[in-house]
UniProtKB/Swiss-Prot annotation:
Keywords recorded for this protein, A-Z: ATP-binding, Nucleotide-binding, Transferase, Ubl conjugation pathway
PANTHER family for the chain: UBIQUITIN-CONJUGATING ENZYME E2
Gene (name only): ube2f
InterPro entries hit by this protein: UBQ-conjugat_E2_core, UBQ-conjugating_AS, UBQ-conjugating_enzyme/RWD
EC number, UniProt record: 2.3.2.34
Region feature Interaction with uba3, mapped onto this chain: 1-29
Record pathway: Protein modification; protein neddylation
Catalytic activity: [E1 NEDD8-activating enzyme]-S-[NEDD8 protein]-yl-L-cysteine + [E2 NEDD8-conjugating enzyme]-L-cysteine = [E1 NEDD8-activating enzyme]-L-cysteine + [E2 NEDD8-conjugating enzyme]-S-[NEDD8-protein]-yl-L-cysteine
UniProt KW Aminoacyl-tRNA synthetase keyword: no
Known role: Accepts the ubiquitin-like protein NEDD8 from the UBA3-NAE1 E1 complex and catalyzes its covalent attachment to other proteins. Together with the E3 ubiquitin ligase rnf7/rbx2, specifically neddylates cullin-5 (cul5). Does not neddylate cul1, cul2, cul3, cul4a or cul4b.
Single GO molecular function: ATP binding
Pfam family, one: UQ_con
Protein name listed in UniProt: NEDD8-conjugating enzyme UBE2F
Species whose genome carries this gene: Xenopus tropicalis
Length: 185
């Protein structure tokens, strides 16, 4: 099977054996994004949290993949939460687009899948938003942390979930467990 990594390796070998006058239109340049992704995906796979798995539906499209987070602690323990990650052409100047595909009761993720994670913000006033120095590894570790140390009830996207937690923590836990049983198995 031809993957983007093997294609890049093959193209580099072909490029090295050609002179500029023999380069044809059939040998297309690989985008900066795709070159970065080859390195970043290798780094990500070597440093993946034990609670996460990545899946590339098409191994030739490293710019589109799924992440499964299976927290082993917190309110969300026992759930399997799917995220869709799409890396735009302008990467690494802009962050990846991320959506939660699993319905969840969470203060930082809406029931429709929008996510509040500062490093996914293109423009941030506090300096914690996206920067070209960030990588896919940062994104995956950040998403994983939304279920533990980055779980933030004080700056919610899903205000109803945060207020629910403030009102009655036991009831909140019950609703989270119900959502896990119904949507995250």
């Amino acid at each position: 099977m031809l993957t983007l990594a093997s294609k890049l390796k093959r193209d580099d070998g072909v490029k090295g054996s050609r002179t500029s006058s023999t380069t044809s239109d059939s040998t297309r340049r690989v985008s900066v994004r795709d070159r970065l992704l080859v390195k970043e995906v290798a780094e990500l796979e070597a440093n993946l949290p034990c609670t996460c798995k990545v899946n590339f539906p098409d191994p030739n499209k490293l710019h589109y993949f799924h992440l499964t987070v299976s927290p082993d602690e917190s309110y969300y323990q026992g759930g399997r939460f799917q995220f869709e990650i799409e890396v735009p052409d302008a990467y690494n100047m802009v962050p990846p687009k991320v959506k939660c595909l699993t319905r969840i009761w969470h203060p930082n993720i809406t029931e429709t899948g929008e996510i509040c994670l500062s490093l996914l913000r293109e423009h941030s006033i506090d300096g914690t938003g996206w920067a070209p120095t960030r990588t896919l590894k940062d994104v995956v570790w950040g998403l994983n942390s939304l279920f533990t140390d980055l779980l933030n009830f004080d700056d919610p996207l899903n205000i109803e979930a945060a207020e629910h937690h403030l009102r009655d923590k036991d009831e909140y836990r019950n609703k989270v467990e119900d959502y896990i049983k119904r949507y995250a198995r």
